[in-house]
Amino acid sequence: MKYQDRITTEPGKRGGKPIIRGLRITVYDVLDYLASGMSEEEILSDFPELEQEDIRACLAFAADRERKLVSGA
């Protein structure tokens, strides 16, 4: 799975921040929920429009962004 298939940016949604499949849920939102201790199951229960692959895409997006920051790309 390529995260680019699930993570998009749209100028009119959430200020152009990376969002999941055109929904109004940002990558940051999902990462923040995980960092606060929510499990994937809790997130999926609270946001039934999300899929497990969406959460994995958020993690892949964050890893790719970190890799680019470290490498200076």
List PLM regions with ranges.
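Basic, low-complexity segments
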Residues: 1-15
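Conserved phosphate-binding loops in nucleotide/dinucleotide-binding enzymes
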Residues: 19
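Long, charge-rich, low-complexity alpha-helical segments
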Residues: 26-73
